Design a protein with these regions (language model features):
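FIC/Doc superfamily catalytic core
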Residues: 1-163
Length: 163
């Protein structure tokens, strides 16, 4: 579902890039065992084909769930997958990135604001985590230690203030 292979093989260069972005965005949902809705696949195709912008995808997703509120656990999971996929696709289309704590925090906030608790989205965690990943057959991703993120963030702030 949603791999957009026909666009990757036969599409124009812009379509190929958009299809790749959507494939990544949707594929990343599998880490949390989430599957996007058929509606997202449809509007993603509209974006790939140039009928709507990536911003309009997010707007249409928001309108869709306002009109059709998620009620079952599966619908809530689809809603989360749809919203985060649209945000990832937008992020991938920006062509900018810097490997820094500020960028990490900004990405996390833009992906999860309104989805995760306000205390979590865009915040550096203060505790270490291990999370069994379905896509890894129950193994965990090696997450960075919270203490390191806090230290790096503090050093960066200190450098910016003094520098």
């Amino acid at each position: 579902m949603g791999d957009f292979e026909e666009y990757k093989r036969q599409g124009e260069p812009d379509q190929q890039k958009k299809a790749e972005n959507w494939g990544i965005a949707i594929g990343l949902q599998k880490v949390d065992d989430l599957t996007p809705s058929k509606y997202l696949i449809s509007v993603a195709k509209d974006n790939i084909e140039g009928r709507i912008s990536v911003d309009e995808v997010a707007e249409q997703i928001a309108r869709y769930y306002k009109k059709n509120p998620a009620q079952t656990p599966q619908e809530h999971n689809e809603k989360e997958a749809d919203e985060v996929s649209a945000r990832i696709a937008k992020l991938l289309s920006t062509h900018t990135f810097s490997f820094s704590p500020a960028e990490y925090i900004s990405i996390h906030k833009s992906l999860f604001s309104g989805i995760l608790d306000v205390e979590i989205a865009g915040k550096i965690r203060t505790y270490d985590i291990i999370k069994e990943e379905t896509v890894l057959n129950g193994d965990t991703v090696i997450y960075g230690r919270a203490k390191c993120w806090i230290m790096i963030s503090g050093l960066k702030k200190s450098f910016l203030i003094k520098g």
